Amino acid sequence: MKKLFISGLIIFVVCFVLASVMWFGFERQNNKLNTAHKSFPNDKINGLHISSQNSFVEVKRGKQFSVSYKGQKKLNVQNHNGTLYIKEQRNSEDHYGLNFNPFRKIKEHLVVTVPDKKLKQFDLKSKRNRVEVNQLDVEKAKINMAYEGIVKVGLNRSNVDKLFYRGKNSPVTLTKDKIANANIKSSNAHINAEESLIEKSVLLVTRDKDIHLDKMDINSNFKASSENGDIIMSYNRKPENVLLKLNPSDGKSKVFNSSFNDDKVGKGDNVLEMYTEKGNIQIN
């Protein structure tokens, strides 16, 4: 009985090893490096539509419209009526969650270069990894990170006339931007901004995450709400024309900035309206 058990165990181990070697070999062939580079005339493109699976997506300023990709996915790039559609396609699915293949070492990287011109539309969605958008000038932008995966989104030195952002588990950071008419909503991730001007906008976090606004432009005016997190804001210089409407339900509001007298500076044309349920509101 013991010999039979040992023989069966040996057969099982040998079969498992052979199957693993064959599987990894197949996956290695299936996960070869794919590179692509395409350029487009600057006067032919007025909009961008980017759909990524799990690449590090980088949008940056340059002399000419171009798309560069390195990774394991297939990339589909098409110009349709002045809009450049960039889609990272899934090659195969891992239905069993066996994501331990040692050959999967390539890090996908998608770079989109945009010349110094104002776009009409910018659409971006991704499932995981990181997104960095730099020096983008656009009339309307829609950034959708509504998937379960985490995508760290950065919008830097950009000018957006109208912004729509949705991030389920994806934090967004605005750095040195000029943003107007924004609708920014995060279900389970922070909203951060630094040295930015935000006007006529709404910032909303629906769970216990915070809204951090550091060294903001003194002409910022918007509404912000965090269900159970805190809202913390500071200015880049002494405010001159601001009215605070701070509404914490169970939390506290604290104004440490000495420029304010009864939550007001000057005429109060730039209104900051903030709400929390259990979190605190702090103006530094």
Where are these regions (language model features)?
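Hydrophobic membrane-insertion alpha-helices, especially the h-region
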Residues: 6-23
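Acidic/polar low-complexity surface segments
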Residues: 8, 14, 99-102, 258-264
